[in-house]
A protein has these predicted regions:
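Alpha-helical transmembrane anchor segments
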Residues: 2-34, 184-270
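A generic, lipid-embedded transmembrane alpha helix
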Residues: 47-64
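Juxtamembrane helix-capping/reentrant segments at transmembrane boundaries
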Residues: 42-46
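Amphipathic, cytosolic membrane-interfacial segments at TM-TM junctions
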Residues: 37-40
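Structured inter-helical modules in multipass membrane proteins
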Residues: 88-186
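Transmembrane signal-anchor/signal-peptide helices with a preference for the extracytoplasmic
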Residues: 59-80, 243
Length: 270
């Protein structure tokens, strides 16, 4: 959707307001300004009829609200898992020391790329960073070098890293990749336009039903449409504001990742 190109909280609010104005005006014009619904003056619809499309619209909004909450919950879990995996990688000792130092540098490079590129105000986790991916690959390659050097006995002068520690690092790397993939998949929202178009169309049908039930009185119909469209605007706004956990209202803050990066830069890790 066009509003997704803007970062401000006002973008989805104004976009949904425009949707609802368009729905209300088009419904009013179709019902009261054309002959399509003129027969309802003499043969009106039963008032309970308007509840059917409205209930369907309410169910759709409930479904989309649930999806928005799940997105936020999954995004928060992914952030926790990502920071936890990085902390585990940093806290497991690697021998010889030069491998430990290079691993820390790769982690620092990964965090820097993730925070400046993927979490940036420009991308909002919508696309992956090639630098971050390269840092992950180099980090994993470094771990395998440690394992290979010990297995071949190439570093007899140094204490080899315990195989259990290497297994733990490899598992943490897998957890880190999975958490990053989940974060990026939640940030990519380009494929949901069809759902919004169907929601707008269902809202239009519900507004049309509200106007059609009041066909005999234009003023009453206009009042009902205004109230319904205002309610629809609030529903649309709430969903659009929270559907993406990395943009607009209540967006996640990568503070745990930033804290780890600051710790690495200050040299507190080995």
């Amino acid at each position: 959707m066009i509003y997704e190109s803007f970062n401000g909280v006002a973008a989805p609010i104004l976009a949904t307001f425009a949707w609802c104005i368009g729905i209300g005006l088009s419904s009013y014009c179709l019902v009261f300004k054309t002959r399509l619904f003129s027969h309802l003056i003499t043969s009106p619809l039963a008032p309970p009829f308007l509840a059917l499309p409205a209930i369907m619209f309410a169910f759709l909004m409930a479904f989309m609200s649930s999806e928005a909450w799940q997105n936020f919950s999954h995004a928060r879990t992914a952030l926790i898992n990502e920071s936890s995996a990085i902390s585990q990688i940093l806290n497991i000792p690697i021998q010889p020391p030069e491998f430990q130092k290079s691993s820390n540098l790769y982690v620092q490079s990964y965090l820097g790329s993730v925070l400046t590129d993927e979490w940036s105000a420009k991308h909002h986790n919508e696309s992956s960073s090639l630098e971050a991916q390269n840092s992950l690959d180099k980090l994993e390659s470094n771990v395998w070098k440690v394992s290979g050097a010990c297995n071949q006995g190439a570093n007899k002068s140094h204490t080899c890293t315990d195989p259990i520690a290497i297994s733990a690092i490899i598992k943490a790397l897998g957890d880190l990749r999975n958490a990053r993939t989940q974060r990026l998949s939640l940030g990519y929202q380009e494929g949901v336009d069809t759902k919004w178009f169907l929601g707008i169309f269902l809202g239009f049908i519900a507004a049309l039903a509200v106007a059609a039930v009041h066909r005999s009185n234009a003023k009453t119909g206009a009042t009902a449409l205004v109230l319904f469209c205002l309610s629809m605007w609030i529903s649309f706004s709430m969903v659009t504001l929270y559907i993406n956990p990395y943009k607009w209202a209540d967006r996640l803050d990568p503070a745990p990742l930033g804290l780890i990066l600051e710790t690495l830069k200050s040299g507190h890790n080995r």
